[in-house]
Amino acid sequence: MEARYVIFDLDDTLVHSDAVRAAFGVVAEEMGVTRASMSSLLDAMPGRPAFEIFLALGLRRAAARAAAGRFLSLLHDLDSELPTVAYPDAASTLQALEALGSTLMLSTGSSPARAARVLEQEGWDAFSLVLGSDRETLKGAAHYEQISAEATSSDWTSHAATIGDSPRDMRLGAEHGVPIRIGIDRDGDASALLEAGATHVVSTLSDILPILTAA
């Protein structure tokens, strides 16, 4: 296996938590939207930044940014009540990739502070770049621009892989020329991931290792 840049999503890829949906639910109710409606929207837009979720509810950009700020504040508080839990194979998978010489990067819709807190909680210090989302920078093209600025070669994407649970992760990878796009499907329906450009779909995180080793 050649040394690769491996870009990971965070929530529902490396870790899981009830705090994210709980925070969205509280903000939804404050806006007069039912938790059930918000849950359906989150199912339809997995992995999207909070700002985009609130835009999809019909809010104007300024109101959506304010709602996203409220969401992040609630998420910070709820994290202590509803702790983030790593998937059982997350640590060993990251360790294996580090041993193979991979450059690990994190691109998440969560805030930079929460991303850093989760990595510290789990003792995951192998990530060379940790990109969160806030009012200035959202997960998406802006994160790829930051990765390009940090990469040691201009053709870094040709030696990259992206790992995530949402169609958006796959779409972003395809749009930016990442050849290996691995979707994590733990629900048994990979159609949305494949339609969005996933080159591989796995059900557990450790299943990415044979794919990356053979590439």
Where are the predicted features?
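Glycine-rich phosphate-binding loop signature in dinucleotide/nucleotide-binding domains
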Residues: M1, A99-S102, E150-S158, A215
